[in-house]
Amino acid sequence: MPADPLKFAYWVPNVSGGLVTSRIEQRTDWGYDYNRELAVLAENNGFDYALTQVRYMAGYGAEQQHESTSFSLALLLATRRLKVIAAVHPGLWHPGVLAKLGATADHLSHGRFAVNVVSGWFKDEFTALGEPWLEHDERYRRAEEFIRALRASWTEDRAELAGDFYRLRGFSLKPKPLGTAGRPHPEIFQGGNSTAARAMAGRVSDWYFSNGRDVDGVAEQIADVHDSASRAGRRPPKFGLNGFLIARDTEAEARETLREIVARADTEAVEGFGAAVRQAGRSTADGKGMWQDSTFEDLVQYNDGFRTGLIGTPERIAERIVAYKRLGVDLFLLGFLHYHEEVEYFGRRVLPLVRELEAADRTGPASVPAHA
């Protein structure tokens, strides 16, 4: 079990439509003013990180979207402690250019910039931008090379790389990003559920993000990533888990909210999203790409967030969160239906219970049920 207190991140709603593809009311907004207020509220309610989404075209319930790196910088400048993770596609960036942007953002925010490397997502976006859409495992091979080039740009005086996808020839980045003990450069996050994703995370990433999973699925993923890191001779990346959180005063209220979200799902958008993302992972060597076993209900929340089971009373959710920590989860990436009020509710009602359970685990044997 990680010794450090759990970290919490939230999905930034910088695209329209909220975090569920449903016609249920979502008291949220994709605009900057709303998100600036949300970022301040989040850092005052126990959140350590925010993750901006990367979308380039309308579709699947998201008709409007702000670009992730520029939006991340705006949120960094509006906050004092919150770390903001910008999602990027290797196929649409040169790592040296992103390294330059990241170094500047890191200085402007006093060391709070981070990046999430997204290997896949939507083929239609790459096609519309005139860029090649690689097969699944090739996308991860490119992403690994991207991360190596990014890290070299941030840490070496004259970075050199002669890769299959990128080249650096004596690239000298000045100023370097701000380095501190335990953080020599901006943190590098990476997502993915496939075998290729897990192997890559063990070799090069600082953090590994998983889609929503049950306890058994998370334990399997953590073991795979740690095994990959061991073979690479490096410390394993920290583990982040996605979850859509529905905390209510009673279990019945929480379950009814979930039932209504799914009952009012935008069927056409959910099925279109499912077809698009399954195509992205279908070409894996072992057929274990992201979303390959996701049900319709899972897909209503883009990243299988219902599967993590953070639905119920504050007490039940806190127990569930700490049960995952005992498996090795270091961070939860959370989404909400009504962001402002639910982030505040989380900070006031759920987080104190999590900290109490963590303290109890440090002083005695674990006895909290997982409610799997």
Task: Name these PLM-found stretches.
Residues 1-78, 176, 180-186, 368:
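N-terminal beta1-alpha1-beta2 module of alpha/beta enzyme domains
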Residues 1-14, 40, 129, 136-182, ...:
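An alpha-helical appendage that flanks or caps ligand/catalytic pockets
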Residues 2-3, 40-44, 73-81, 102, ...:
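Acidic (Asp/Glu)-rich catalytic clusters
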Residues 6-10, 50-52, 83-88, 113-117, ...:
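Hydrophobic faces of well-ordered beta-strands that scaffold small-molecule active sites
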Residues 8, 42, 46, 75, ...:
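Conserved, mostly hydrophobic/aromatic
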Residues 18-33, 87-96, 132, 137, ...:
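Active-site mouth loops of central-metabolism enzymes
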Residues 29-42, 98-101, 191-200, 258, ...:
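Short, acidic/polar
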Residues 62-85, 142-146, 346-362:
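Alpha-helix-loop-beta-strand connector modules within alpha/beta enzyme cores
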